[in-house]
């Protein structure tokens, strides 16, 4: 299983709603939090941004950080 699919599966189990915008962009949302991920293929993250109450909060290129965000 590739990183993108694995992240989609684990986030769904934690109550996140995933929307695939296109072949490179996924948006996860739950409550007031929205996380936007941009991928290079299905295994390499280009970057991700987290928004809380529609305000930009942080940016990362680290998949481990994204996993931590999704554990909120």
Language-model features and meaning:
Residues 15-44:
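Amphipathic, interaction-prone secondary-structure segments
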Residues 37-61:
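Intrinsically disordered, low-complexity regulatory segments enriched in Ser/Thr/Pro
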Residues 67-72:
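Short, charged, intrinsically disordered terminal tails
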